Curated annotation (Swiss-Prot):
Reported function: Substrate-recognition component of a Cul2-RING (CRL2) E3 ubiquitin-protein ligase complex of the DesCEND (destruction via C-end degrons) pathway, which recognizes a C-degron located at the extreme C terminus of target proteins, leading to their ubiquitination and degradation. The C-degron recognized by the DesCEND pathway is usually a motif of less than ten residues and can be present in full-length proteins, truncated proteins or proteolytically cleaved forms.
GO terms for MF: ubiquitin-like ligase-substrate adaptor activity
Cellular compartments annotated: Cytoplasm; Nucleus
UniProt name for this protein: Protein fem-1 homolog B
Species this chain originates from: Gallus gallus (Chicken)
Organism ancestry: Eukaryota, Metazoa, Chordata, Craniata, Vertebrata
Residues in TPR repeats: 344-377
Extent of the ANK repeats: 45-74, 87-116, 120-149, 153-182, 186-215, 218-248, 483-527, 531-568
TM stretches of this protein: none
Pathway: Protein modification; protein ubiquitination
Pfam families with a match to the protein in the record: Ank, Ank_2
Record-level GO BP terms: apoptotic process; proteasome-mediated ubiquitin-dependent protein catabolic process; protein ubiquitination; regulation of DNA damage checkpoint; ubiquitin-dependent protein catabolic process via the C-end degron rule pathway
Alphabetic keyword roster: ANK repeat, Apoptosis, Cytoplasm, Nucleus, Repeat, TPR repeat, Ubl conjugation pathway
Subunit-structure text: Component of a CRL2 E3 ubiquitin-protein ligase complex, also named ECS (Elongin BC-CUL2/5-SOCS-box protein) complex.
Similarity annotation: Belongs to the fem-1 family.
Length: 627
């Protein structure tokens, strides 16, 4: 029956109404109920014949299922739309979201619930608003769809239509008394979403319907959001209509100009100067009431520059692009605040431009500043940390000097991020745990790249001591990847992933220098992963014993000299010697094996299954256990 259900689903999916009717012909009522209620799984989607037929716009199939077989319209499934996975979607939601008006009408006429919500509280009306189908939106509203139902983030139908740029839908919803000042969880209104996306006509429409200049959860008004997003026409419209005071006007013009200076998509240095100058004129418009700037203290990353305070100072840097770039970054940080989520992106962009021009020192200063801002705001920084490993690797590959103090700074931030990552994993819900673990593991690997880079950098004794302190700090936290591997396991493992953007020009594993450095900083040489393997178990399986003999030799010697037990068994009762995959590693291991009487005795106890628990000191029990 399951095989037949697959054929039924396929026929419904492809709109083959005659085939579907033939498959169901002369079937018992219970069989038909089973076949038409069967949930098929394809490409991450889970749906019934009715849902997939509605999703694909097969009107005749939907009519057959509803009128002849009385299929329940409230069946739910999991579907993909525009890259999003929608759980709990009905056939009506799918038809509305995919723009199949005839199917929508069929379903509604057969009693489909127009206000049924998905797991995230999305309605069919919201799906139609997302797609911009005014005809479907009108039909649903005329059939009692509630325009005020928001999704689980309190994001309304008006907000999604405003963000997606569907002017006619926005106008209709406002005419139906949708609240233009409703707030989402993040504090944003429809005006915020339209302003950020630069939809001028929608902004004009919302203002006409008395949308207020409200502040969102990040302290941003729609005017500020438009300025930060380089939407000059929206800024000028809001300045003309919003009745904002002089300070707000100045701030918006400054933020707009500053944003044009360091935006990858909207870079325009002429507009930077133009809007900064307009803001400066506004400050000095009334000689009796000049609005002075409250400037930030000088920041090293910005070349210790002080922001221009007079029209003359601004005029003096008009032809100096670099100065205008820095002016833009300073202005943004002053207006938005250092804890604003959007402050760091242009800093990173400007740093990347410096790196592309081989101006690595300035790049690193900016990226370190951005990293500190993001960590201060408790943001995920795995991409930022990896970016440093990439640029340091690029520098080494090009024989450019890398400063040990910069490596140490990034290592320190990595330790903090990995520690926070451990806490995030403990506090994370099951749905997001995969992403949290991915980011955490990425940071562990980045830390190893940075350690590897440090071994290829000129360091004074003091610098090396500082680097070692950060390595010690992380070893002390004992971070593990999914398979229970420690830093030392990954340092000796050829399967350790290496980022392929510059990093793999400099870093590779197994790595003898990284292994030695980790051991010098206190790494546990006999730590085991989830399978009971010690680092020694892993290195003896290295598949390049001849071409990379020195690495294999150095690591085995380092591990044994640090106290690695050559007779230690994993969960399969295999010693490193048993796990050796080549004659070379076997010979190297045998030449290093100096079994103590204590080890021989422990092995004998294990081999002959002699009872030892609660008969010897507890510290010895652990020792016997891993032999």
């Amino acid at each position: 029956m399951e095989g037949l259900a697959g054929y039924v689903y396929k026929a419904a999916s492809e709109g083959r109404v005659l085939t579907l009717a033939a498959l169901l012909l002369n079937r018992s009522e219970s069989d038909i109920k089973y076949l038409l209620g069967y949930v098929s799984q394809h490409g991450g989607q889970r749906s019934t014949p009715l849902i997939i037929a509605a999703r694909n716009g097969h009107t005749k199939v939907v009519r057959l299922l509803l009128e002849h077989y009385r299929v329940q319209t409230q069946q739910t499934g999991t579907v993909r739309f525009d890259g999003f996975v929608i759980d709990g979607a009905t056939a009506l939601w799918c038809a509305a979201g995919a723009g199949h008006f005839e199917v929508v009408k069929l379903l509604v006429s057969h009693g489909a619930n127009v206000n049924h919500t998905t797991v995230t509280n999305s309605t069919p009306l919201r799906a139609a608003c997302f797609d911009g189908r005014l005809d479907i939106v009108k039909y649903l509203v005329e059939n009692n769809a509630n325009i005020s139902i928001a999704n689980k983030y309190d994001n309304t139908c008006l907000m999604i239509a405003a963000y997606k740029g569907h002017t006619d839908v926005v106008r209709y919803l406002l005419e139906q008394h949708a609240d233009p000042n409703a707030k989402a969880h993040c504090g944003a209104t429809a005006l915020h979403f339209a302003a950020e996306a630069g939809h001028l006509e929608i902004v004009r429409e919302l203002v006409k319907w008395k949308a207020a200049m409200m502040v969102n959860g990040h302290g941003m008004t729609p005017l500020k959001v438009a300025a930060e997003s380089c939407k000059a026409d929206v800024v000028e419209l809001l300045l003309a209509h919003a009745g904002c005071n002089r300070r707000s006007r100045i701030e918006a013009l400054e933020l707009l100009g500053a944003s044009f200076a360091n935006d990858r998509e909207n870079y325009d240095i002429m507009k930077t100067y133009h809007y900064l100058y307009l803001a400066m004129l506004e400050r000095y418009r009334d000689s009796e009431n000049i609005i002075e700037k409250e400037v930030l203290p000088p920041i090293e990353a910005y070349g210790n520059r002080t922001e221009c305070r007079t029209p003359q100072e601004l005029e003096s840097i008009r032809q100096d692009r670099d100065a205008l770039h820095m002016e833009g970054l300073i202005v943004r940080e002053r207006i938005l605040g250092s804890d604003n989520i959007d402050v760091s992106h242009p800093i990173i962009y400007r740093g990347a431009v410096y790196a592309d021009n081989m101006e690595f020192e300035q790049c690193i200063k900016l990226w370190l500043h951005a990293l500190h801002l993001r960590q201060k705001g408790n943001r995920n920084t795995h991409k930022d940390l990896l970016r440093f490993a990439q640029v340091f690797s690029q520098m080494i590959h090009l024989n450019e000097p890398v400063k040990a103090k910069d490596i140490e700074s990034v290592l320190r931030c990595s330790v903090l991020e990995i520690e926070q990552g451990m806490s995030r994993i403990k506090a994370t819900q099951d749905d997001d745990i995969h992403t949290a673990v991915d980011n955490y593991e990425c940071n562990i690997f980045t830390f190893l790249y940075l350690v590897c880079i440090s071994t290829k950098t000129q360091c004074s004794e003091e610098d090396q001591s500082r680097i070692n302190k950060q390595i010690y700090n992380l070893i002390h936290l004992d971070p593990r990847t999914r398979d229970g591997s420690t830093l030392l396991h990954h340092a000796v493992n050829s399967s350790t992933p290496v980022d392929d953007f510059h990093t793999n020009d400099v870093c590779s594993f197994p790595n003898a220098l990284v292994t030695k450095l980790l051991l010098d900083c206190g790494a546990d040489v006999n730590a085991v992963d989830n399978e009971g393997n010690s680092p020694l178990h892993l290195i003896v399986q290295y598949h390049r014993p001849i071409s990379d003999f020195l690495t294999l030799h150095s690591i085995i010697i380092s591990l044994v000299e640090a106290g690695a037990h050559t007779d230690m068994t994993n969960k399969q009762k295999k010693t490193p010697l048993d796990k050796s995959t080549t004659g070379v590693s076997e010979i190297l291991l045998k030449t290093q094996m100096k079994l103590s009487l204590k080890c021989l005795a422990a092995r004998a106890v294990r081999i002959y299954n002699i009872s030892y628990q609660n008969q010897i000191p507890r510290t010895l029990e652990e020792f016997v256990k891993f032999h």
